[in-house]
Amino acid sequence: MNLNSKDWKNKKESDLNSICLDVRTKDEFDEGYINGAINVDFYDSANFVSHLSNIDKKKSCYVYCKSGKRSYAACEIMKDLGFKNVYNLESGYMGWVENGYETIG
């Protein structure tokens, strides 16, 4: 499900049984990220899918990238793998920052 920054933030903050995935590259992640995010590079496909296999599919997953495109694709893969509650930050990290929300780094 695609959510705008405000809705994604509010839903994520109220969801205590969730995980946040940053699917950007390590270099992008090192420049700044959303608090609590785990970096899993979407472009490293073998490790991406391997990492997903270690996540409880019952947990809600909040996924973002730079602009929302990679994270959308990641969400589609996750749904195909059986994840039920997957939320894409449609404006990505750029939209998050533009809205003035807190980041690390």
Model-identified regions with their sequence ranges:
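Rhodanese-like catalytic fold shared by cysteine-dependent sulfurtransferases
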Residues: 1-19, 26-60, 66-105
